[in-house]
């Protein structure tokens, strides 16, 4: 009788776990995956530098967001040999009138701008590099959004590239472990920010996507080797990289991918990752290097 009561108790406990979490296997898999990420030895990355708009910069330049002629000033002072990735959304005209100054600075540098998915319908989708599709239609597999917040034409037409900063947190943990390289918005396909950074970095002009009966199989940047993805065009992000971080007030190094983002307290929302909270531009840096390596 004791044996049967033990079995019954075990069944009740397992049923309770199943009700509390309909997919305990998935949760265990996430725990294992996160532990693996946390145990990896950090690798120093030399070709990507995080440029932080930090407390010192806010104190010097004033409340954020800044007038865009201030951003233009830092671009003008930086080396022409670097690639500038601005992980901020310029979807409306600068009320201080700095757009023309930023546009002129962008003409002198290689700059990639950000867009962001939105739940609001949007007309038109800005200036993006298109994605050629091979095989099956991937429409039912790609993450789809009603619209995009995209940079104003004054800026996007001066940029080398524009990409979407889409990340899909895993349920039920809310942790970002992977990111889509291609998304759909307003009925069309668009590259992620990290993917477009790689396109500009490699000097390629276009993308292609191969899909089959089970979803997306790979994405290719120009003539580069295909990047194998899951069915939803996602890749896992390797978070064991270590990047040099500098203030935007510091001299900007040359021959680097410079990824700009806000770290000043109260101005940015950190993203949950398997190794702890990170600022959004740091997540982008890990994603870029994951694909590079």
Where are these regions (language model features)?
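Non-transmembrane functional regions of envelope-associated proteins
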Residues: 2-220, 253-293
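Substrate-access "cap/lid" subdomains that shape
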Residues: 208-250
């Amino acid at each position: 009788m004791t044996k049967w009561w033990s079995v019954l108790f075990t069944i009740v406990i397992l049923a309770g776990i199943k009700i509390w979490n309909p997919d305990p296997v998935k949760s265990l898999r996430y725990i294992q995956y996160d532990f693996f990420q946390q145990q990896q030895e950090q690798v120093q990355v030399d070709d990507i530098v995080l440029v932080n708009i930090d407390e010192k910069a806010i104190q010097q330049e004033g409340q954020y967001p800044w007038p865009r002629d201030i951003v233009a000033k830092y671009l003008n002072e930086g080396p022409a040999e670097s690639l500038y990735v601005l992980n901020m959304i310029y979807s409306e005209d600068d009320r201080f009138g700095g757009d023309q100054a930023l546009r002129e600075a962008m003409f002198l540098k290689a700059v990639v701008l950000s867009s962001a998915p939105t739940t609001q319908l949007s007309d038109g989708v800005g200036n993006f590099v298109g994605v050629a599709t091979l095989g099956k239609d991937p429409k039912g597999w790609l993450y789809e959004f009603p619209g995009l917040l995209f940079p104003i034409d004054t800026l996007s037409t001066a940029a080398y590239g524009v990409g979407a900063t889409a990340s899909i947190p895993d349920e039920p943990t809310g942790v970002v472990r992977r990111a889509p390289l291609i998304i759909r918005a307003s009925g069309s396909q668009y590259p992620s920010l990290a993917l477009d950074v790689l396109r500009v970095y490699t000097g390629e002009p276009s993308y292609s996507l191969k899909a089959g009966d089970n979803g997306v199989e790979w994405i290719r940047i120009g003539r580069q080797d295909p990047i194998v993805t899951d069915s939803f065009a996602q890749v896992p992000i390797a978070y064991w990289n270590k990047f040099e971080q500098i203030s935007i007030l510091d001299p900007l190094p040359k021959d680097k991918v410079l990824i700009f983002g806000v770290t000043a307290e109260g101005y940015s929302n950190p993203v949950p990752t398997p190794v702890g909270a990170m600022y959004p531009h740091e997540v982008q840096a890990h994603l870029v290097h994951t694909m590079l390596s």
